[in-house]
A protein has these predicted regions:
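Membrane-proximal basic amphipathic "stem/tether" segments
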Residues: 1-72
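S-adenosylmethionine/decaboxylated-SAM
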Residues: 77-81, 85-264
């Protein structure tokens, strides 16, 4: 009985600390450190030495206001967020990036329901081609590398790209299917102006997709990654590319989002 009481008291103490940190504690000067301590404890990261919290997001930030002027992009379905989707604000950022780069060809890795695909189509010229690559459900058992366990449900969907099916803008979209680790990108070499990477979030796949996209992006083109701050495999891979590969030294994390971007 005493053990159960101790557990209950411990739970109440943790709940109190979390509640304070996420409310009144946010007003304090040490709020960021406190949040990082909680984050690191939940993710099994133990700070060393002076117990300074470990911030896993090392890529420099850029302010969204440095990227755009007035928000003139058109949006469709931005309020219909859910698991696996970009947020409303992220979708607006991506839409504005597409408008700013005015691409002739966009290549997307990871179609899912096609919400971002549709909005990129709506915010690009009528002659822009959007190619979107998705792993079919039947390909789950034969991927070249392992995907994250939590991603299986995003692959096992009834329809890929259902958001843009039947939409007038769908005429600009070409769906292709396969595993990005074994897909032949040769047809698209040096022909892509904007690439959006939102496929598997496993470390090896993020490295693979980033490398593959580098072979198809034109000089002056834009690479966009989603979920930099949401999946350990993504931030680990992008941090590594930023620190070790000169080609990726210009990556920036757009503040207030999980988006990272690189002008090639």
């Amino acid at each position: 009985m005493s053990k159960a009481f101790d557990n209950l008291r411990l739970y109440a103490g943790v709940l109190k600390r979390v509640g304070y940190t996420l409310t009144l504690g946010m007003l304090g000067s040490g709020s960021r450190d406190e949040l990082l301590k909680l984050y690191n404890s939940y993710n099994g990261q133990q700070p060393s030495g002076d117990s300074t919290p470990v911030d896993p997001f090392i890529i420099p930030k850029t302010d969204v206001f440095e990227l755009f002027g007035n928000d003139s992009a058109a949006y469709e379905g931005v309020y219909e967020c859910g698991f696996g989707h970009t947020t409303e604000f992220e979708l607006k950022v991506i839409s504005n990036l597409v408008r700013k780069w005015n691409p002739r060809r966009i290549f997307e890795i990871g179609t899912f329901e096609g919400r971002t695909t549709l909005n990129m189509a709506l915010n690009s010229d009528t002659d822009t081609e959007i190619v979107t690559l998705d792993l079919p459900a039947e390909g789950l058992a034969s991927t070249k590398m392992e995907i994250e366990e939590g991603e299986v449900r995003y692959v096992k969907k009834e329809v890929s790209g259902e958001r843009f099916m039947g939409h007038p803008a769908a005429s600009k979209i070409r769906q292709v299917f396969g595993d990005s680790a074994s897909f032949d990108f040769e047809e698209y070499r040096n022909s892509v102006d904007v690439a959006f990477i939102d496929g598997s979030h496993a470390y090896e796949y993020v490295l693979n997709d980033s490398e593959k996209v580098f072979t198809i992006i034109r000089k002056g083109g834009l690479i966009i990654w989603h979920d930099y701050t949401n999946w350990p495999g993504v931030w680990t891979a992008l941090n590594e590319l930023y620190e070790r590969d000169p080609r990726f030294k210009g990556i920036r994390h757009i503040g207030g989002t999980s988006i990272a971007m690189l002008t090639v």
